Amino acid sequence: MSRKKKSRNPGASGAPEFVVTRNRTESDVEGRLRKRAKKRKGLKTGSRNSDAEEQKRQAAAQKRDPRLGSKKKIPLIVEPVKKQTKQERRLSAEQELEMLENDAQLNVLLDRIEAGENLGTGLQKYVDEKLDRIEKLMDQLGLLEPEEDEDFTAPAVKGSRNDDDLLADFDDINFDDYKG
């Protein structure tokens, strides 16, 4: 089969059969718009420089060692550490006691115990340690009252005795028996 040459004639296949005529002003406006769009293909002017500056600033901020350039004075002679006085230690014991009494977790666990709930071994151990520490601190600060024996009971009164009977018993006591 022989080859057929393409032609630009309006009757040829693929080419429009009618010709559009535009007036001069439309063509000029379109041309200017195309030219302007062609000029603005790339990035905005100066964007290369401003982006690079920002990146350099960020990189410099990340790389800079915070220890360099410190204005803090460095002592050349090491001074010996003085021990805390008894009053300072007492103050710190008071602070520790205050912290333990205000411990939210300990308070919640104590509330659970009072409600009759059984705690796990770890939580029970934690509560016991904290309560022991509170007791030691209170004893150290002199806030702990000596415990009285709860098992001690007053001797049972045999019947009702009046003052005359008690006075008679007192008079009958022989104090010579108690001399050593």
UniProtKB/Swiss-Prot annotation:
Residues 1-90, 145-180 are annotated as: Disordered. Residues 33-43 have a biased composition (Basic residues). InterPro entries: YihI (IPR007336). GO terms for biological process: ribosome biogenesis. Keywords: GTPase activation, Ribosome biogenesis. It comes from the Bacteria. GO terms for molecular function: GTPase activator activity. Residues 23-32, 50-68, 80-90 have a biased composition (Basic and acidic residues). Residues 165-180 have a biased composition (Acidic residues). A GTPase-activating protein (GAP) that modifies Der/EngA GTPase function. May play a role in ribosome biogenesis. Interacts with Der. Belongs to the YihI family. NCBIfam families: PRK05244.1-1 (NF003560). This is Der GTPase-activating protein YihI. It comes from Vibrio campbellii (strain ATCC BAA-1116). The gene is yihI.
